[in-house]
Protein backbone atom coordinates (compact mmCIF):
# COMPACT_ATOMS: atom_id res chain seq x y z
CA UNK A 1 0.00 0.00 0.00
CA UNK A 2 1.37 3.37 -0.96
CA UNK A 3 0.39 5.48 2.04
CA UNK A 4 -3.33 5.75 1.35
CA UNK A 5 -4.34 4.81 4.88
CA UNK A 6 -7.35 2.60 5.41
CA UNK A 7 -9.41 2.10 2.31
CA UNK A 8 -7.72 0.30 -0.51
CA UNK A 9 -7.88 1.25 -4.15
CA UNK A 10 -8.55 4.97 -4.16
CA UNK A 11 -7.54 6.58 -7.44
CA UNK A 12 -7.14 10.32 -7.00
CA UNK A 13 -9.44 12.55 -4.99
CA UNK A 14 -12.77 11.55 -6.52
CA UNK A 15 -14.07 14.38 -8.67
CA UNK A 16 -17.38 14.33 -10.55
CA UNK A 17 -18.87 10.99 -11.49
CA UNK A 18 -19.85 10.46 -15.09
CA UNK A 19 -23.36 9.19 -14.53
CA UNK A 20 -24.71 10.57 -11.29
CA UNK A 21 -28.01 8.91 -10.38
CA UNK A 22 -30.69 11.54 -9.85
CA UNK A 23 -32.48 10.90 -6.55
CA UNK A 24 -36.06 12.07 -6.70
CA UNK A 25 -39.39 10.99 -5.27
CA UNK A 26 -37.78 8.21 -3.22
CA UNK A 27 -40.33 8.77 -0.49
CA UNK A 28 -42.81 6.86 -2.67
CA UNK A 29 -40.65 3.81 -1.90
CA UNK A 30 -42.40 3.81 1.48
CA UNK A 31 -45.34 1.84 0.15
CA UNK A 32 -48.94 1.82 1.29
CA UNK A 33 -48.63 -1.71 2.72
CA UNK A 34 -45.47 -0.70 4.63
CA UNK A 35 -47.29 2.22 6.25
CA UNK A 36 -50.24 -0.08 6.97
CA UNK A 37 -47.90 -2.59 8.70
CA UNK A 38 -46.38 0.16 10.86
CA UNK A 39 -49.86 1.30 11.85
CA UNK A 40 -50.87 -2.27 12.69
CA UNK A 41 -47.80 -2.58 14.90
CA UNK A 42 -48.99 0.55 16.68
CA UNK A 43 -52.42 -0.99 17.26
CA UNK A 44 -54.40 0.77 14.50
CA UNK A 45 -57.34 -1.15 13.09
CA UNK A 46 -58.68 1.07 10.28
CA UNK A 47 -56.73 3.60 8.22
CA UNK A 48 -58.04 6.58 6.24
CA UNK A 49 -56.83 6.92 2.65
CA UNK A 50 -55.38 10.37 3.37
CA UNK A 51 -53.00 8.97 5.97
CA UNK A 52 -50.45 7.56 3.53
CA UNK A 53 -49.22 10.85 1.99
CA UNK A 54 -49.31 12.55 5.39
CA UNK A 55 -47.22 9.75 6.91
CA UNK A 56 -44.68 9.99 4.08
CA UNK A 57 -44.35 13.74 4.67
CA UNK A 58 -43.87 13.37 8.43
CA UNK A 59 -41.38 10.52 7.97
CA UNK A 60 -39.40 12.55 5.42
CA UNK A 61 -39.07 15.53 7.80
CA UNK A 62 -38.10 13.25 10.70
CA UNK A 63 -35.43 11.44 8.68
CA UNK A 64 -34.05 14.71 7.27
CA UNK A 65 -33.55 16.02 10.82
CA UNK A 66 -31.93 12.82 12.11
CA UNK A 67 -29.65 12.48 9.07
CA UNK A 68 -28.63 16.15 9.23
CA UNK A 69 -27.57 15.73 12.88
CA UNK A 70 -25.83 12.39 12.20
CA UNK A 71 -23.85 13.91 9.32
CA UNK A 72 -22.90 16.86 11.55
CA UNK A 73 -21.44 14.41 14.09
CA UNK A 74 -19.60 12.61 11.28
CA UNK A 75 -18.12 15.81 9.86
CA UNK A 76 -17.05 17.00 13.30
CA UNK A 77 -15.13 13.75 13.77
CA UNK A 78 -13.49 14.35 10.35
CA UNK A 79 -14.91 11.11 8.95
CA UNK A 80 -16.72 10.37 5.73
CA UNK A 81 -18.67 7.35 6.97
CA UNK A 82 -21.76 7.80 9.12
CA UNK A 83 -21.63 5.22 11.92
CA UNK A 84 -24.41 3.70 14.00
CA UNK A 85 -23.19 5.77 16.95
CA UNK A 86 -23.64 8.99 14.95
CA UNK A 87 -27.28 8.05 14.42
CA UNK A 88 -27.69 7.06 18.10
CA UNK A 89 -26.32 10.44 19.22
CA UNK A 90 -28.47 12.29 16.68
CA UNK A 91 -31.58 10.53 17.99
CA UNK A 92 -30.55 11.20 21.61
CA UNK A 93 -30.14 14.89 20.77
CA UNK A 94 -33.74 14.94 19.56
CA UNK A 95 -34.98 13.28 22.73
CA UNK A 96 -35.49 9.81 21.21
CA UNK A 97 -32.88 7.69 22.96
CA UNK A 98 -32.21 4.39 21.21
CA UNK A 99 -30.63 1.48 23.06
CA UNK A 100 -28.78 -1.51 21.67
CA UNK A 101 -26.40 0.10 19.17
CA UNK A 102 -23.54 1.15 21.46
CA UNK A 103 -22.90 4.41 23.24
Curated annotation (Swiss-Prot):
Gene3D superfamilies: Histone, subunit A
N6-propionyllysine: modified positions: 9, 17, 32, 45, 78, 80, 92
Processing after translation: Butyrylation of histones marks active promoters and competes with histone acetylation. Glutarylation at Lys-92 (H4K91glu) destabilizes nucleosomes by promoting dissociation of the H2A-H2B dimers from nucleosomes.
Assembly: The nucleosome is a histone octamer containing two molecules each of H2A, H2B, H3 and H4 assembled in one H3-H4 heterotetramer and two H2A-H2B heterodimers. The octamer wraps approximately 147 bp of DNA.
Entry function: Core component of nucleosome. Nucleosomes wrap and compact DNA into chromatin, limiting DNA accessibility to the cellular machineries which require DNA as a template. Histones thereby play a central role in transcription regulation, DNA repair, DNA replication and chromosomal stability. DNA accessibility is regulated via a complex set of post-translational modifications of histones, also called histone code, and nucleosome remodeling.
Annotated positions of the N6-acetyllysine modification: 17
Localization, UniProt: Nucleus; Chromosome
One Gene Ontology cellular component annotation held by this UniProt entry: nucleosome
Name by which UniProt lists this protein: Histone H4
Modified residues (N6-butyryllysine): 6, 9, 13, 17, 32, 45, 78, 80, 92
Stated family: Belongs to the histone H4 family.
Keywords: Acetylation, Chromosome, DNA-binding, Hydroxylation, Methylation, Nucleosome core, Nucleus
Amino acid sequence: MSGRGKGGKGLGKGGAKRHRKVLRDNIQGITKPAIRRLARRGGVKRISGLIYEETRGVLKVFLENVIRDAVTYTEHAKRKTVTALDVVYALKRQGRTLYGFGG
